[in-house]
Amino acid sequence: MTREMTGAEMVIQALADQGVKHLFGYPGGAVLPIYDALFAQKDVKHILVRHEQGAAHAAEGYARSTGKVGCLLVTSGPGATNAVTGLTDALMDSIPLVCITGQVPTHLIGNDAFQEADTVGITRPCTKHNYLVKRIEDLPRILHEAFHIASTGRPGPVVVDIPKDVQFAKGLYSKPKDFPHIGYQPKVKGDLDKIKAAVELMASAKKPMFYTGGGVVNSGKHASELLRELVKLTGFPITSTLMGLGAYPAADPQWMGMLGMHGTLESNMAMHDCDVMICIGARFDDRITGRIDAFSPGSKKIHVDIDPSSINKNVHVDIPIVGDCAHVLEDMVRLWRTGAKQADKKALGDWWKQIDKWRDRKSLAYRQSNEVIKPQYAIQRLFELTKDQDTYITTEVGQHQMWAAQFYGFQEPNRWMTSGGLGTMGYGLPASVGVQLAHPKSLVIDIAGEASVQMTMQELSTAVQYRLPIKVFILNNGYMGMVRQWQELLHGSRYSESYSEALPDFVKLAEAMHAVGILCEKPGDLDHAIKDMIDIDRPVLFDCVVDPAENCFPMIPSGRAHNEMILGDAADSLDSAITEEGKMLV
């Protein structure tokens, strides 16, 4: 069934038909017809952000915590360009977004009109796909196609750029079922022969290792359930990338902790020494592999990924399997069960003994203090006091992000929202706005740094406006901590522009925005202050003043292999451990 509508009305109707409940945006001249159509309906609730980057990150948080497509609406020119950072972030981390942008009228495109920008050209490298809609007849198909592309295959952001005259034009609107999307149908079922070969290789392993990533989370909760079943069936150890945290429970004894530059010693050493690596939904990025030519040199590698371009891109693998993680894991579980497969118990037992020796090194250990709050301790206490609640965590980017990954134990998928690939400072606060809207009864905490959070601090006002009781837990060390750490370790402690000399009073800043501010400076006061934060049913800025000199360990020096990892007690040797080539990789 078709109905005549304006282009602006089609946009809102398409969002409603796609199940969109919340739309993050900021109005401007080139999208006023869409905002007028928005005013006339009640199906889609608009959330007015303070900056278009905030709209993109809020949509990311919404999408990552629900598995649904996140949506944003921005005007032409600076509205679209302000959203580019968030779009790039979503592309790097495989987050499904649909971004509707306004554009100058079609007859003015290319004339340097007011607030004109080549949105399609600018966003081509940072989107999964983008469109410039020149005809009203194409608009319904493109809108529905955008959701299909964003949410299938490897998820990602899609931009639909709509000139203002197309928004005013009238045409016939059709619902999603009228468009079969025959042009884009990514492969979800893995090749069965390759899956059989993978299972046979797994059964022959002496020192196996599961290496999982954000693709498991993106595949849905069933994928996480199947992963847990397969890990239990095999008895193999498992690690994860930053983006994959929560797909496997951190409390389980087979969990090795996070992998990579700031991962645990046991996970990195096991990856280096394993003989069979089962990579599921990860992409072998540089923060995971360390030096490529020394990455897990003795292992046969199985790689499961829905994106064929990710396979053999960075690391050559022996058994490539293109398919959705849930579908492939289902086949793996079935074949392991029906084939009555069993790992070599003696070899696996010896492997676990070696892993326990690495665990005994306690690579995440740090020196406690009764005088100053250690950032690791702050995260540990935050975890202990919130783990029994319905909690979602977002982060900014920096040392605090790594400490959160190391010390906050995630038991379920979709509970951890962070900027992994792009490393976007300012991601966490607006992302928490999106998460809180999606989960209004849940406890949503942004673990932040005092430098990073200032990138998008204005979005606290958004939380206040919509009565979203987000908690911003700031680890305040007075520095851009990760920058300071690298300057200390690589540049002779020459702290060039990494000290935040004019920090705001976060308590007063919170109060100025009609939120609540809390200051905590002593370890003995921390538990009580965190409990107060949790109990307050309003947005809270929690200024947790931590040790300014604390560094984030363990770490793999840039350009080094996994078995060259340095623990905190060996930090003095780090400068000599990093090669000149490695310094370029920081």
Give residue ranges: language-model regions.
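Glycine-rich, anion-gripping cofactor-binding loops and their flanking helix/strand elements
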Residues: 64, 214-302, 410-441, 454-457, ...
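Phosphate/pyrophosphate-binding active-site segments
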Residues: 1-2, 137, 200, 205, ...
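Glycine-rich phosphate/diphosphate-binding loops that line cofactor/substrate pockets in enzymes
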Residues: 8-20, 61-67, 91, 149-154, ...
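A short, small-residue-rich loop immediately preceding and capping a beta-strand
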Residues: 21-25, 44-47, 65-104, 211-212, ...
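Thiamine diphosphate
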Residues: 100, 108-109, 114-115, 268, ...
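Glycine-rich, acidic loop regions that bind phosphate or pyrophosphate groups
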Residues: 101-142, 164, 244-353, 530
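Conformationally flexible catalytic loops at phosphate/diphosphate-handling active centers
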Residues: 145, 149-204, 364, 567
